Amino acid sequence: MTTTVEQVVTALEQRYPVELASDWDAVGLVCGDPAASVQHVLFAVDPVLSVVDEALAVGADMIVAHHPLFLHGVHSVAPITPKGRVVHTLISHGIALYLSLIHI
């Protein structure tokens, strides 16, 4: 049986309800197809490019990170910016990103 991004998210949110997060916490699925298959999940503190590179190196299909990628309004995710590079790399390699600031 294949595990999906949606199933991983559901399991996380059943164990660590989103309602426990503060109002300002940026939690949830940032990118990734909920129907995509997940075989390996990488847990990290920060969703930075070095973590994405590690996910690629170990064959992770999903990253669960503690700190948010975007905490305030975003005006660009152009790949010339650090956060934009993260987003573009995740999407181009089909890696899902789930954020859970306080509640995990």
Predicted regions and their residues:
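Polyanion-binding loop/helix "lid" in catalytic or ligand-binding cores
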Residues: Y98-S100
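Catalytic-core regions built around general acid/base machinery
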Residues: P82-L90
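Short HxH-centered metal-ligating active-site micro-motif
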Residues: V45-I80, H93-A96
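Conserved small/polar residues in nucleotide/adenosyl-binding loops
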Residues: I102-I104
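N-terminal glycine-rich anion-binding loop in soluble enzyme alpha/beta folds
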Residues: M1-Q39
